[in-house]
């Protein structure tokens, strides 16, 4: 079964047509049964979403939801938080992260939880941003690198926060960029168990490399990517030895099997390998497996 979702957010104004009152957010969620390729009963297109307190009136709204996980009878969706300045009609920077929570399977009791421990989006892009640990707690990635592949920024940050008993844990924050000592951006991470996780990340402090061309035929660029092993319990990181010239924005799925983490890595437009890392080892070196073949505008995006 798969979850289908959509959120709409439309600015609302008072009767005078000029006084901004907030955004009306409506969520649609459906269950797709792969066995029969039909939507199951319980589909809802009228979930009204309200932000806590005065955040809505202040211009905050959620513009996207993604990467749901299920824990203790609730779905947790990562969220892209936006803020609207009614006086200028333009977007402003935000100062918090949010998660959309709803009961499963009934799709009732929609709520938003928030934290100011980290700032940015929790919905990611294709790579999972949320992982449930052995205790049913949720590790969640927050990245303010937002436009990965854009201009390198010295303030790009990647954090892991924790959701416990349905709320953000105010005592927990893991800072990837802080431990690496350099600005970073990411789209998500993979949990290997017992607090160990692997995260592809963009090295925002390094010169950009060409990764392809845009629809207009112009070169497109990104800072090169790396891979790190995070110990989310002991607050440590190992920057793993991987090839230069990686671009992992599109990477979607890795595999953990028999204590090994598997990922396919190849520099842009070049051949590569399957890399295997021992989950229980802090060595930065992995083992090279099968060779992979790539060409212009070809990217490996997952292992299954």
Predicted regions and their residues:
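Eukaryotic scaffold repeat domains enriched in small/polar residues
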Residues: 1-16, 70, 130-135, 254-256
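Short glycine/acidic-enriched loop and turn motifs that connect beta-strands
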Residues: 17-18, 24-30, 82-87, 145-149, ...
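Intrinsically disordered, low-complexity segments enriched in Gly and acidic/Ser/Thr residues
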Residues: 168-270
């Amino acid at each position: 079964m798969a979850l289908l979702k959509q959120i709409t957010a439309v600015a609302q104004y008072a009767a005078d047509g000029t006084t901004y009152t907030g955004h009306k957010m409506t969520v649609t969620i459906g269950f797709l049964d792969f066995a029969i390729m039909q939507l199951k009963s319980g589909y809802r297109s009228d979930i009204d979403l309200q932000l806590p307190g005065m955040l809505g009136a202040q211009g905050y709204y959620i513009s996207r939801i993604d990467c749901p996980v299920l824990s203790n009878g609730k779905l947790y969706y990562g969220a892209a938080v936006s803020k609207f300045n009614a006086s200028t009609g333009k977007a402003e920077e935000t100062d918090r992260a949010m998660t959309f929570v709803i009961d499963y399977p009934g799709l009732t009791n929609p709520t938003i939880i928030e934290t100011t421990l980290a700032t940015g989006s929790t919905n990611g892009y294709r790579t999972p941003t949320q992982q449930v640990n052995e205790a049913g707690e949720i590790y969640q990635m927050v990245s303010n690198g937002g436009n990965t592949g854009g201009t390198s920024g010295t303030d790009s940050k990647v954090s892991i926060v924790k959701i416990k008993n349905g709320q953000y844990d105010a005592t927990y924050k893991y800072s990837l960029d802080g431990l690496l000592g350099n600005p970073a951006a990411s789209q998500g991470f993979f949990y290997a168990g017992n607090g160990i996780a692997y995260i592809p990340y963009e090295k925002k402090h390094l010169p950009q490399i060409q990764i392809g061309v845009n629809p207009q035929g112009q070169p497109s660029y990104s800072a090169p990517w790396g891979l790190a092993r995070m110990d989310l319990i002991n607050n440590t990181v190992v920057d793993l030895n991987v090839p230069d010239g990686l671009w992992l924005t599109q990477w979607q799925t890795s595999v953990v099997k028999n204590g090994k983490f598997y990922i396919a890595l190849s520099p842009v437009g070049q051949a590569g390998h399957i890399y295997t890392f021992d989950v229980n080892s802090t060595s930065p070196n992995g083992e090279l497996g099968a060779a992979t073949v790539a060409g212009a505008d070809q990217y490996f995006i997952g292992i299954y």
